[in-house]
């Protein structure tokens, strides 16, 4: 066995293994699952086939799955046309405004991730830290990137 065990891996594999352990440490099943799947795809040499699709359409597929989850109460009739009146309540109006603002901010976060992919590792580590120390729930890198974009815009005001 080589004395330089870690040099047997490519740098991308080392990053994925690091993320895997951070996910285990932070009890983030999403990070663990994603890291394992990507490592398996690389191991079985499917990366050339699958990674381009994931890079170009993966976020879209993930958002479709998220929307299916969010809209499933409509399909199962747990929410009906009668529930539409709730949008006019104070809570409903706040939710409407928050959804609109969050969509704008998420767009900024997505643009930031596309322009600066090097922030993704920091977003992932920050997510794990939030789970561990703030008892947070991982909501995905797009929202974390949106907050990062806001922080960067605020910082640019002072520079």
Swiss-Prot record:
One matching Pfam family is DUF441
Q: Can you say where in the cell this protein is located?
A: Cell membrane
Q: Which UniProt keywords apply?
A: Cell membrane, Membrane, Transmembrane, Transmembrane helix
Kindly list the GO CC terms recorded for this protein: plasma membrane
* Topology class, membrane: Multi-pass membrane protein
The principal location of this protein is: membrane
Family (UniProt): Belongs to the UPF0756 family.
Q: Please identify the protein, giving its name as recorded.
A: UPF0756 membrane protein PTH_1668
């Amino acid at each position: 066995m080589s004395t330089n065990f870690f040099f047997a891996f490519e740098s991308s594999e080392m990053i994925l293994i690091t993320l895997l352990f951070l996910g285990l440490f932070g009890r983030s099943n999403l990070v663990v699952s994603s890291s394992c799947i990507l490592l398996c795809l690389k191991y079985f040499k499917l990366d050339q086939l699958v990674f381009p699709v994931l890079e170009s359409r993966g976020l879209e597929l993930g958002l479709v799955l998220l929307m299916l989850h969010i809209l499933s109460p409509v399909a199962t009739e747990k929410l009906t046309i009668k529930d539409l009146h709730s949008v006019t309540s104070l809570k409903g109006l706040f939710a409407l405004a928050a959804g609109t603002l969050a969509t704008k901010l998420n767009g900024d976060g997505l643009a930031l991730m596309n322009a600066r992919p090097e922030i993704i590792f920091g977003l992932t580590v920050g997510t794990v830290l939030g789970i561990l120390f703030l008892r947070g729930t991982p909501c995905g890198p797009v929202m974390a990137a949106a907050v990062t974009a806001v922080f960067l815009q605020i910082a640019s005001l002072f520079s």
